[in-house]
Amino acid sequence: MPKLEMMLLVLLILPLPYFDAAGGQSVHVDGYGDGLARYLQRGERAVKKTCIRSTPGSNWGRCCLTKMCHTLCCARSDCTCVYRSGKGHGCSCTS
């Protein structure tokens, strides 16, 4: 099988919600957050962080291992979430 066909096959098999251009990790959570807790405790991520659901009533949500600012993930935990008129929410990180 040529490489291009193999790559397209792999992309069709992988679920698209796992790819998130805005940063963070999209995870499937159940109504009680157990799925999210399992994700956060996997490997070296034994931390408790908050997640937001993608849409109200959805079982999909986004988890940030640093800090969440509206729907974005900040680069570091010490960043603050700010709102800039005309630009929306963003992270302000101290150097």
UniProtKB/Swiss-Prot annotation:
Domains (record comment): The cysteine framework is XX (C-CC-C-CC-C-C-C-C).
Molecular function, one GO term: ion channel regulator activity
Compartments (UniProt record): Secreted
Annotated family: Belongs to the conotoxin D superfamily.
Propeptide span(s): 25-45
Tissues where the protein occurs: Expressed by the venom duct.
Disulfide bond positions: C64-C73, C69-C81, C74-C91, C79-C93
Protein's name in the database: Alpha-conotoxin PiXXA
Modification 4-hydroxyproline occurs at: P56
Gene source species: Conus princeps
Bilayer-spanning residue ranges: none
An example Gene Ontology CC term for this record: host cell postsynaptic membrane
Function of the molecule: Alpha-conotoxins act on postsynaptic membranes, they bind to the nicotinic acetylcholine receptors (nAChR) and thus inhibit them. Through its two C-terminal domains, this homodimeric protein would bind to two nAChR allosteric sites, located outside the nAChR C-loop of the principal binding face and at the adjacent binding interface in a clockwise direction. This toxin slowly and reversibly inhibits the ACh-induced response of the human alpha-7/CHRNA7 nAChR subtype (IC(50)=6.2 uM).
Post-translational modification: The homodimer contains 10 disulfide bonds.
Signal peptide: 1-24
The entry's keywords: Acetylcholine receptor inhibiting toxin, Disulfide bond, Hydroxylation, Ion channel impairing toxin, Neurotoxin, Postsynaptic neurotoxin, Secreted, Signal, Toxin
Subunit description: Homodimer; disulfide-linked.
Record flagged with keyword Signal: yes
Extra remark beyond the main annotation: Negative results: does not affect the human alpha-3-beta-2 subtype (when tested at 6.5 uM).
